[in-house]
Amino acid sequence: MCDVVLGSQWGDEGKGKLVDLLCDDIDVCARCQGGNNAGHTIVVGKVKYDFHMLPSGLVNPKCQNLVGSGVVIHVPSFFAELENLEAKGLDCRDRLFVSSRAHLVFDFHQRTDKLKEAELSTNKKSIGTTGKGIGPTYSTKASRSGIRVHHLVNPDPEAWEEFKTRYLRLVESRQKRYGEFEYDPKEELARFEKYRETLRPFVVDSVNFMHEAIAANKKILVEGANALMLDIDFGTYPYVTSSSTGIGGVLTGLGIPPRTIRNVYGVVKAYTTRVGEGPFPTEQLNKVGETLQDVGAEYGVTTGRKRRCGWLDLVVLKYSNSINGYTSLNITKLDVLDKFKEIEVGVAYKLNGKELPSFPEDLIDLAKVEVVYKKFPGWEQDITGIKKYEDLPENAKNYLKFIEDYLQVPIQWVGTGPARDSMLEKKI
C-alpha cells in the first residue's frame, strides 16, 4: 500500500521534513510529478542534503527511489543533484531508478521558458515561473511532440537517429516561435549522446516497478511536489505549475490504481505563503507579513525568492481537502507564530457582501473577495522543540483544535522548530 505526502496550499509547506520522518520506515520512495522546480533541505546529523528532483528517500540506505513517469527530467540537473549528494557521502546510485516514460527537459525548454516569461512581463501577466523549463516540457508532452527517456536510452542505432530527428524538429519549432535565440543544438546533442550510456543503468519500466513493489507488500511513500493550489486544473490558474499536483497526479504519474492508496497526508503551514504572482486573499502587506517572512525565513530553496506571507486560510484548505481527501494533517512551523499577541485565521470569503459557498475559480472574483477572519489569542512563548502535544500552550492547542474542527481532519504531526527532530506526533 502507498502513503502519500501532498502540499495543501501554494507550496513550501515543509513536505520534505515529514517525508524525512516517514522515510526511516519505508521500502520505496517515489516522485510522481514536477521537476527540479521545487526544493527542500534535509539535515541528517550535521550534513545538509538539498533535494530538487530526486526522491528524499535516498537518505535511507535501505530505501529504493523512483523518479516516476509524471516527472520531467533535466538530465544535467539530475546528475548534478546526484553527484552533490554523493559528494556529501550519500551512497545512493544503486537505489535510484528513473521511469522510461518520463519526459526530458532540454536546455532550449529552459531558454524558451525565460523568453515566454519576459514576453508576459511586458504585458504585466508574468506567471512567476522558476525558468527551469518545466512548463514548456509539459507543453510539448501535451502536444505529443515531446521526447521521453526511452527514446534516449534505447541502444538500437535507429532509435538514436529518431531521437535526433525529434530533437531538431522541436528546436526548429521553438525557433520559429521565438526567433533565432542563442543556442547550440549540436553541442546539446553531443552531450545527450553521452547521456545515452550514463542514464541507461537507472532506467526502469516504472509501472512494473511499482506494481511489483505493491504485490510484495512493500511500504511505499509517494512524495508530492508543489501543492494543490498550484495544480494545473484545480489551482489558481493560470498562476500555477504545469502538472497535476494533487492526488490525481499521484495515480497518473506513477500508473497505480486508487485502491493502492492508504493514507493521504496533507502538509499545512501554520500560516500561508506564496511565491510568484496571483491573488492571495490573506496576504499581509504589513508588519505581520514582514514578521512571518523574517521569523519563518521565507526564501525559496530553488530560486532564493522572497515568499509572500499571510494568515492561515481555511477556505483554501477546505477546498484542498475536498480534492485530495486528507486522512490526517501535518501542521508545520507553528513556532513561527510564537511571538504574536493575536493570530487571525481566514474562515470565509465574501463577494459583494455575500458569503461564497466555496473557493472561487475566477481570479477576478478571488482578487476582490473580502476575507472573514476569526481572531485567536497568541501563546507568546517559545514552543521550539516541544515533543509532546500535551506540553503545548493552551492557546496553541486551541488554535490547532479549531483547524481540526473546521476541516474535519485530524492533525497527526506538529512542527515546533527548524531542527529535524522538532516534530511532535499527536495520537489520532
UniProtKB/Swiss-Prot annotation:
Pfam families assigned to the protein according to its UniProt record, in alphabetical order: Adenylsucc_synt
This entry carries the following GO cellular component terms, namely: cytoplasm
Q: Where is the active site?
A: D12, H40
Paste the cofactor note: Binds 1 Mg(2+) ion per subunit.
User: Is the keyword RNA-binding assigned to this protein?
Assistant: no
Q: Which domain of life is it from?
A: Eukaryota
Which GO terms label this protein's molecular function in UniProt?
A: adenylosuccinate synthase activity; GTP binding; magnesium ion binding
Q: Which InterPro entries match?
A: Adenylosuccin_syn_GTP-bd, Adenylosuccin_syn_Lys_AS, Adenylosuccinate_synth_dom1, Adenylosuccinate_synth_dom2, Adenylosuccinate_synth_dom3, Adenylosuccinate_synthetase, P-loop_NTPase
Report residues binding GTP.
11-17, 39-41, 307, 333-335, 415-417
Q: Which residues are involved in binding IMP? A: D12, E13, G14, K15, N37, A38, G39, H40, T130, R144, N226, T241, R305
Identify the PROSITE patterns for this entry: ADENYLOSUCCIN_SYN_1, ADENYLOSUCCIN_SYN_2
Keyword set, alphabetical order:
Cytoplasm, GTP-binding, Ligase, Magnesium, Metal-binding, Nucleotide-binding, Purine biosynthesis
What is this enzyme's catalytic activity, as reactions? IMP + L-aspartate + GTP = N(6)-(1,2-dicarboxyethyl)-AMP + GDP + phosphate + 2 H(+)
- What are its E.C. numbers? 6.3.4.4
The cofactors named for this UniProt entry are:
Mg(2+)
* Subunit note: Homodimer.
* Role: Plays an important role in the de novo pathway and in the salvage pathway of purine nucleotide biosynthesis. Catalyzes the first committed step in the biosynthesis of AMP from IMP.
Family (UniProt): Belongs to the adenylosuccinate synthetase family.
Question: Can you name this protein?
Answer: Adenylosuccinate synthetase
Organism of origin is Candida albicans (strain SC5314 / ATCC MYA-2876) (Yeast)
Supply the gene name: ADE12
